[in-house]
Amino acid sequence: MKLHRLALTNYRGIAHRDVEFPDHGVVVVCGANEIGKSSMVEALDLLLEYKDRSTKKEVKQVKPTNADVGSEVIAEISSGPYRFVYRKRFHKRCETELTVLAPRREQLTGDEAHERVRTMLAETVDTELWHAQRVLQAASTAAVDLSGCDALSRALDLAAGDDAALSGTESLLIERIEAEYARYFTPTGRPTGEWSAAVSRLAAAEAAVADCAAAVAEVDDGVRRHTELTEQVAELSQQLLAHQLRLEAARVAAEKIAAITDDAREAKLIATAAAATSGASTAAHAGRLGLLTEIDTRTAAVVAAEAKARQAADEQATARAEAEACDAALTEATQVLTAVRLRAESARRTLDQLADCEEADRLAARLARIDDIEGDRDRVCAELSAVTLTEELLSRIERAAAAVDRGGAQLASISAAVEFTAAVDIELGVGDQRVSLSAGQSWSVTATGPTEVKVPGVLTARIVPGATALDFQAKYAAAQQELADALAAGEVADLAAARSADLCRRELLSRRDQLTATLAGLCGDEQVDQLRSRLEQLCAGQPAELDLVSTDTATARAELDAVEAARIAAEKDCETRRQIAAGAARRLAETSTRATVLQNAAAAESAELGAAMTRLACERASVGDDELAAKAEADLRVLQTAEQRVIDLADELAATAPDAVAAELAEAADAVELLRERHDEAIRALHEVGVELSVFGTQGRKGKLDAAETEREHAASHHARVGRRARAARLLRSVMARHRDTTRLRYVEPYRAELHRLGRPVFGPSFEVEVDTDLRIRSRTLDDRTVPYECLSGGAKEQLGILARLAGAALVAKEDAVPVLIDDALGFTDPERLAKMGEVFDTIGADGQVIVLTCSPTRYGGVKGAHRIDLDAIQ
């Protein structure tokens, strides 16, 4: 299968795109992110797999959001002997068109065209291989599964050197075996289809036999229950008659007891009324006697209360006099304490003022010392600021002076020395210098540079040194200039002056540091402004009239101690008098309270006595004392007679055993009620069983049981026949599975060898992989280090996934080949391996079609023979 052309119109965000692909080689389709590269693969799948009227989510989601139009996909494909142009429009005005160009021209539309394409692809394309030969963004690192690719299996059979001739129908045979197996079992091995129906039929037949047998047993049980219920009804009728006679006898005895009980209840009511009357008259007589006793008692209590009140009044007067004396003594002690406290406060204030004066003197001396040191430090800092020479400038001057000395020595060592000896008195001119020589006197000059010597009016001699000397002269001049610049920057005349100035600077720095340290020690943790503020506060707090000459700190402290001692003594005396006064006041309050309480009590007793005497006079006016006593005695005799009547009736009632009679009546009634309910229930159950038996007689349950047993025999026979076929299909499938596994073991080695051939240029000569029977890569070995596939980096997984697909593409026969689609892979790969992967692409591209979609075309720059398509240029 080869893809020659793909055109998209109104597909997602793509308005129109038409891309043509070469028949073989590597095609790199590049474009920016979200330009629609992955949409091209998606569009090809929609074209081949879905009808134009499909309403599935995959089709709906590609409709453009900015226009109400249909999405259109056109592809030109060759597969086996066929070459065709296939077009579909989805969503709006749905259309399907097919033009077959080879082997003979055909034109079809609609579902007929769709089915024709699927038929051609089913004949010529290994669908599993077509889907496996893709590296998509969403699963670029997943291990590829090539086990279901028949085209690759045939190729690996040939590569493995299988002696058996391939007929091309192996896959069809396996499919037929799988189809036969699927008639009886699900993929997980559970019964399904005909086998499941046979199992279900047998189970249903056995359940029907069980149900019918249960129904027949139910009829037998109904006959047995009818007999038992008939006997039970007769027995319950006899028991009910006997218990009804027992109930009647119990009722007669209960009625007799009820009559006695009524008489006893009436007697109790009479006795209760007599008791109430007797109680009232007795209570009235007792109340009269109690009132007389109360009057006598209250008279004595009034006399005693008045005596106690008089005594409490005397005690109150005594306590008041004592309290007044204690209060006067407390007032005197308080005045003495106040005077002593004033003296103590004055002495303490005098001592604090003396301490503040001493602290002010110390602070003044300290601040004077600080001011002197700050003045010295400011003078040192001023002298330091006047020194422009720094340590760096000194180092620069020393380096420049050393360079001048070295340059002068080198220049002197290579320069010519010219000596003049005057025969007569003569004057020489050397530059701006005039030299006078007397006869016989000598003078020499070193020619470090071009030098002119003139004898005025006689000659001019020019001495020119060599090139080396000129170079040294230039360096010497530069060194001198550097020295002059450094001296000027340091404002010194020469090196000695610079060193002297540096020594002076160091001494000034040391002096400044000493003064700073001394100043820090004097200030401590406080700032100078704080010290000055404290001094001002101390000075401002001193009174103008304080005589500090006549008083010293020791005298003031002694006076304060004496006054404090007097204050403490006065406080103790005051506290003692306060406690005494408080005790006297407390006693006065207690006696006053007691006197008041006793006076109130005497008044209350007198009032109660008057009230009692008034109440007695009122009662005597109504009933006299003798009449009240006679009535209480008569009511008591009536009560005794009524109580005796109650006792007699209670004895008579006890003799009849009312509890036993009531229990017998209740037991007999319960027994009759229970037997009546059981009798009625038995009659009802007997009727229901009779009705059920009459219904069972019309249902033919025995016949149904015979029919169910016959159906079970037929179902068991059918179950056995289908079971034999199902087991045979399962056995054949397991044999073919073992054969397929054995065959796949032969596939592994040629596939693994092809992987090694393609992978060693990328990973190196030590590259090896382990492949399972499903042709999945399980591990990779480099330099004798084996790493499971799941533990590899994302880049290594991508590279192995691409190599696995390229190996499959290299192995399949030319007529079975499908395009290898790679969607934006190798993003995790370093540049060196990218170049090596490019060589592998070139190798595979020579025989097959490899389509690479990428947003970074530089990744595939190593693919020398690639055909490149820029989507940005064809938008």
UniProtKB/Swiss-Prot annotation:
Cellular component GO terms held in the UniProt record? peptidoglycan-based cell wall; plasma membrane
Identify the Pfam families for this entry: AAA_15
Q: Which InterPro entries match?
A: AAA_GajA/Old/RecF-like (IPR041685), P-loop_NTPase (IPR027417)
| Source superkingdom | Bacteria
Q: Give each disulfide bond as a residue pair.
A: none
> Which PANTHER family does the record match to this protein?
DOUBLE-STRAND BREAK REPAIR RAD50 ATPASE, PUTATIVE-RELATED
Q: What is this protein called?
A: Uncharacterized protein Rv1278
What organism does the UniProt record list as the source? Mycobacterium tuberculosis (strain ATCC 25618 / H37Rv)
